[in-house]
From Swiss-Prot:
UniProt xrefs under Gene3D superfamilies: N-terminal domain of the delta subunit of the F1F0-ATP synthase (1.10.520.20)
Xref: NCBIfam families: PRK08474.1
Record's keyword annotation contains Secreted: no
Organism domain of life: Bacteria
Protein name per UniProt: ATP synthase subunit delta
Species for this entry: Campylobacter concisus (strain 13826)
Pfam families per UniProt: OSCP
Primary location class: membrane
GO CC terms, sorted: plasma membrane; proton-transporting ATP synthase complex
Function: F(1)F(0) ATP synthase produces ATP from ADP in the presence of a proton or sodium gradient. F-type ATPases consist of two structural domains, F(1) containing the extramembraneous catalytic core and F(0) containing the membrane proton channel, linked together by a central stalk and a peripheral stalk. During catalysis, ATP synthesis in the catalytic domain of F(1) is coupled via a rotary mechanism of the central stalk subunits to proton translocation. This protein is part of the stalk that links CF(0) to CF(1). It either transmits conformational changes from CF(0) to CF(1) or is implicated in proton conduction.
Family note: Belongs to the ATPase delta chain family.
Length: 176
C-alpha cells in the first residue's frame, strides 16, 4: 500500500521539479531516509502527542540544503501524516531518476573479490548490451560462482560452478 501512495507523490514531484533540482531533492530525501534507520527517530515521528508542525520542523532540521519546494513537500507529508513514507518515496524516486537518466545500478555477487578492472569491464559490456549506463557494485558471498543482478532492468545473469560440474558429468555419462 505504501508503494502505491509513494508512487503518487513521486509522480507529483517529477511533474513539478526540474531535472537540475532532482538530484538535490533525492539527496535531501536520502538524508532523511538515513534517519529512519534509527529507532529513536521513528518513535519521535510516530509520537501522537507531537503536533504535525513540530514533526515537520524536526524533520526539516535534519536537512542541510533545502529549498522551498522540498520544505513544502515535507510540510505536505506532515499535514497528511505520511512522514513515515519518506524511505518508500526515496526508493521510488531513485527508480524514476534512473529511468530518466538511463542509468542503472546492479550488483555482482560471488565467492571471490572482483578487481576494479573486472568490474569496469563488466559495466562496459552490460552498458553496451542494454544501451544504458550501468554501475555495478561487487560483493562477496557464499554463492559458488558469479551472479550479476540488475534489479531495475529485471535482469539476472549467473554462472554456477556446481551447475557446470553437474552438466559436465551428465554430458560425460551420456557420451559413455
Amino acid at each position: 500500500m505504501n508503494e502505491v501512495v509513494a508512487k503518487k507523490y513521486v509522480k507529483a514531484i517529477l511533474s513539478d521539479v526540474k531535472s537540475n533540482e532532482l538530484n538535490a531533492f533525492v539527496e535531501n530525501l536520502s538524508e532523511l531516509a538515513a534517519a529512519f534507520a534509527s529507532d529513536k527517530f521513528k518513535s519521535i515521528i510516530s509520537l501522537p502527542t507531537l503536533k504535525a508542525s513540530q514533526k515537520v520542523e524536526f524533520v526539516l532540521s535534519l536537512v542541510k540544503n533545502q529549498d522551498a519546494k522540498f520544505a513544502n513537500f515535507i510540510k505536505l507529508l506532515g499535514a497528511n501524516k505520511r512522514l513515515e513514507l519518506i524511505p518508500a518515496i526515496l526508493d521510488e524516486m531513485k527508480i524514476e531518476q534512473s529511468l530518466l537518466e538511463n542509468t542503472y545500478r546492479g550488483e555482482v555477487v560471488g565467492n571471490f573479490d572482483l578487481s576494479a578492472e573486472q568490474l569496469k569491464a563488466l559495466e562496459e559490456n552490460f552498458s553496451k548490451k542494454f544501451n544504458s549506463k550501468i554501475k555495478l557494485d561487487g560483493s562477496k558471498s557464499d554463492y559458488n560462482g558469479v551472479k550479476v543482478e540488475l534489479d531495475d532492468l529485471g535482469v539476472e545473469v549467473n554462472f554456477s560452478i556446481d551447475r557446470l560440474k553437474s552438466q559436465m558429468s551428465e554430458y560425460i555419462l551420456k557420451a559413455i
